Amino acid sequence: MTDQADTSERKPKAAGKTLSLKRTVESGHVRQNFSHGRSKSVVVEKKKKRTLKTSADAAPAAAPAAAPAAAEEVAKKPVAAPEVKPAAPVEERPAPVAKAAPEVKAVPAPAPAAAPAVEKKPSRSRSGVVLRTLTEEEKNARAQALDSAREREGEDRRRAEEEARRFAEEDARREAERAAAAARAAEEASRHTADQSTRTRAAEEAKRRLDDDRPAATPAAARPAKEQAIEEDDDKPKRGAGHTPAKAPPARRSEERRRGKLTITKAFDDESERQRSLASMRRRVERERKKHMGIQEAPQKIIREVVIPEVITIQELANRMAERAVDVMKILMKQGIMLKITDVIDSDTAQLVAEELGHTVKRVAESDVEEGLVGEADIEEAKQARAPVVTVMGHVDHGKTSLLDALRKTDVAAGEAGGITQHIGAYQVNLSSGERITFLDTPGHAAFTSMRARGAKVTDIVVLVVAADDGVMPQTIEAINHAKAAGVPMIVAINKMDKPEADPTRVKNELLQHEVVVEDFGGDVLTVPISAKTGMGLDKLEETILLQAELLDIRANPDRAAEGIIVEAKLDRGRGPVGTVLVQRGTLKVGDIIVAGAEWGRVRALINDRGENVESAGPSVPVEVLGLGGAPEAGDVISVVESEGRAREVTAYRQRLQRDKRVGTGGRTSLDQMLSQLKEQDKKELPIVVKADVQGSAEAIVQALEKLGTDEVTARVLHVGVGGVTESDVTLATASRAPIIGFNVRANTQARDAARQAGVEIRYYSVIYDLVDDIKAAMSGMLSPELRETFLGNAEILEIFNISKTGKVAGCRVTEGVVRRGSHVRLIRDDVVIHEGKLSTLKRFKDEVKEVQSGQECGMAFEGYQDMRKGDVIECFDVEVVQRSLA
């Protein structure tokens, strides 16, 4: 291969060409010749480094003349300084120029050499004339300028020294940190080396022990000649291999497990490989030793915690235990239960099977899905003051509706917004003082009692409206009973005070007859005279409500998941299911997933009582909620859940309960069943609703029932009225789980249908003595029964026998009295009662007998107890339950 360079670029250029910089790249063409007649032309460029030369390097002889010229070019004004008498101002003026161009300071500029250059220019001579003609003021000004320049130079010098000192400190600190890091790295390296040596020694020791445990090698003479020849061939070095050592096996490419603290040295150390721990080596040696010795370890059984619901199939139980379904069926067969793999067993049987297989059991019920639905009680520090919730109750003709309308007119926010646009059953009134009051409209008191029946306390204060000209009416008394049953404070608003026949004193006296003691008579019930027609006393009523709320200290936590109650619900044609919600605590927001009774949904919109869309609603704020799957019932508690799956689970359980209740408990609840429920709940009060034909009979019945009460049980009359049994009476009885007693009265059709649907029992009487006897019997059933023991006999244990199916059986001799099967027994050891239970087996000569007389021998076994010893005494007795009754 030959190279041919083109040097045409190196020829001298024409003289008439424009001047330019000298090129630093020389290019040429080279042709490369290859075999088989192939060639290739290549462009070759040669780059030269351009060096910049100063005038001093180019012409050394002209250096003395160039230096004064440079000094004159950079600092022309300082050169004229010798010609001026005031030397100080002229010397100080070029100070900034000298600072900006430090090169001038390095080049000497003597005055004799610079003076002739300045004298050649006439402008310098004129400048000297100007300086000689300066006035005193100008001289002083220049002197001050020079002084300030000197001060600035001093400050700059001090600042530079401070910067230099700080930089020196930083350098020293960084040097110290580097030294400390180096020391730590050295320490880590030494520790790593020590750990490596320890692991190496442990591995060598383990290998030595493993070699010692292996069986001795077979002698060469005993092995076949072929195997020996093969080994000899293996021992000979391969051709061309020489004495090259054997190639090490490839290292494991897995990452090293980090031990201890990660340091910079460890992070950048790629040579270190993951090493086996000492415990791992020991486990490996132990496994190999057992393998050589032929020891086989049985697989260890895994004990699991099995969650068992109320009912479960055999297949599901086996899956949860990770066992075979056949094994589960075998255990059931041993117990005499023949079932298929798809059959359902109860939780008790499933627990026995799981415990038989060695697993632990966790019993759960369907009602567990509601656990955690209602949040825990809030701490006092998180609670904030909220608006009171007020329910207005009273007779329909006493101005309750007029009072509600008048209170709406006092709402300043409603006046600004143009009035309330719709009525949703609950609304807020914004007072001029900035306070807020939430009013709950409960026509007919139906929603009020249904809320109380579900255990929800929504109302904080009850405002009882009584007409001053009409006094206390039957529905007023019913409203009083509702307020007492709810256990909330009451404020009496005496309405229609603008009429001339108004008599507030009469109203107060009539209230006193129904155990409502007003403040004027020494009680704690506040009274406010008002007039809904003229607006008189409304401000006083609002102040009284706020005062009562302040005494109650009504507070709630707004910073949590919302909880509230459904005031009313309806199915709107355009918007779907709509529920009016009164938030009790927390904040309800758009997008929350809520559960209300047996319905759930995601909040699509919140509408306040003025028809405005809002993003959230805090405590005591009533809003309409859109987005529920169906219309809930009034009084249902609303809760916010974390997911749709949880909401579906809760609502499915509640819907199943409602369906089972409709199917299974369609009949009426009897008085005996209701009393048994009351006993189970440890209630010592018997609630009753009494309706009579005349007021005298009603008062006589109430007095007779009050005399039946004792220290343990008493009759609580919720409501006494004159006239037939109405639907409102049934509603009150449903909420309180009370029977209705009718004396010479009957229930109308609506009340009978409501009682049949709600399961309320209505009893009719015409003789007061029969009524009192039945109530006395019902109250006697609420008393706890008396237990009386009757001694039967004693037996001494002579011997203990172990029976495969039964367990331990005690061979006894009856020493006193008689022993009966199924009676209660006590096991006495050293005159101390060890166990108390029942006899499960009583045998005589392998035959089951009912009783064994004194002096005879028999076999006994206890229910669920096996710790019996020779010499123990068995005491047999009967327990008699004696029902107590009122005297």
From Swiss-Prot:
Enumerate the PANTHER family for this protein: TR-TYPE G DOMAIN-CONTAINING PROTEIN, TRANSLATION INITIATION FACTOR IF-2-RELATED
Report the subcellular localization. Cytoplasm
Give positions of region: G5.
531-533
Q: List the residue ranges of the region (G1).
A: 394-401
What is a single molecular function from GO for this protein?
Answer: guanosine tetraphosphate binding
Low complexity bias located where? 58-117
Could you say which residues bind GTP here?
394-401, 441-445, 495-498
Q: Where is the composition biased (Basic and acidic residues)?
A: 148-178, 185-194, 201-215, 267-276
The UniProt annotation puts the region (G2) at: 419-423
Q: Which family is it part of?
A: Belongs to the TRAFAC class translation factor GTPase superfamily. Classic translation factor GTPase family. IF-2 subfamily.
- What is the role of this chain? One of the essential components for the initiation of protein synthesis. Protects formylmethionyl-tRNA from spontaneous hydrolysis and promotes its binding to the 30S ribosomal subunits. Also involved in the hydrolysis of GTP during the formation of the 70S ribosomal complex.
Chain residue ranges for the region called G3: 441-444
Show the InterPro entries listed in the entry.
EF-G-like_DII, EFTu-like_2, IF2_assoc_dom_bac, IF2_II, IF2_N, P-loop_NTPase, Small_GTP-bd, T_Tr_GTP-bd_dom
Gene source species: Parvibaculum lavamentivorans (strain DS-1 / DSM 13023 / NCIMB 13966)
Q: Where is the tr-type G domain?
A: 385-553
> In its keyword annotation, does this UniProt entry include Nuclease?
no
Chain intervals for the UniProt region annotation (Disordered): 1-291
Q: Record's PROSITE patterns?
A: G_TR_2, IF2
Report keywords, A-Z. Answer: Cytoplasm, GTP-binding, Initiation factor, Nucleotide-binding, Protein biosynthesis
Transferase is among the record's keywords? no
Q: Where is this region: G4?
A: 495-498
Q: Which Pfam families match?
A: EF-G_D2, GTP_EFTU, GTP_EFTU_D2, IF-2, IF2_assoc, IF2_N
Write down what this protein is called. Translation initiation factor IF-2
Q: Which GO terms describe its cellular component?
A: cytosol
